A protein has these predicted regions:
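A short beta-strand-turn-helix
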Residues: 1-9
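Proteins that catalyze or organize thiol-disulfide redox chemistry
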Residues: 2-3, 29, 115-121
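Conserved redox-active cysteine motifs that mediate thiol-disulfide chemistry
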Residues: 5, 13-30
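Soluble periplasmic/extracytoplasmic beta-strand elements of cell-envelope proteins
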Residues: 12, 44-46, 101-103
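Structural microenvironment flanking redox-active thiols in thiol-disulfide oxidoreductases
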Residues: 22-62, 73-79
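Short, conserved active-site loop motifs that form the nucleotide-linked donor/cofactor pocket
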Residues: 40, 67-68
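Thiol/disulfide oxidoreductase modules built on the thioredoxin-like
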Residues: 60-65, 72-118
Length: 121
């Protein structure tokens, strides 16, 4: 994460079998290109044991165009961050410090969420 100091960093942990992950992924994709948020890095991290093809199909089915796929299929990062399930979103400020953790699905396009997030951007 230190490579991204100066940026707001969002780690979103998900899996292809997770219905709430499927619900929130399109709004996370839109957040990536939100013109009101600069210096924003988003890493959607698949914690399942899926192959790349299954993950790509998940993104294709949801028309995800702005995000890359990352993997933590041996759950190293998930364990380091003491994750309890998916979806979980962990937010880091520009100094690389965790400032929020969202457990469960949210709408990343929600006006109140965007207003709150802009305070850290």
């Amino acid at each position: 994460l230190s490579d991204y100091n100066g940026n707001l960093v969002i780690l979103n942990f998900w899996a292809t079998w997770c219905a709430p992950c499927r619900e929130e992924m399109p709004s996370l994709d839109a957040l990536k290109v939100n013109p009101n948020l600069n210096n924003l890095e988003i890493f959607p991290i698949n914690i399942g044991k899926d192959d790349i093809k299954k993950s790509k199909n998940f993104f294709l089915d949801l028309n995800i165009k702005n995000l890359d796929i990352y993997f933590d299929n041996i759950a190293t990062l998930a364990k380091d961050l003491s994750l309890r399930g998916v979806p979980t979103t962990v937010l880091f400020n520009k100094d690389g410090k965790e400032f929020a953790r969202i457990i469960g699905s949210i709408d990343f396009g929600d006006k109140e969420f965007l207003k709150w997030l802009s305070n850290y951007n």
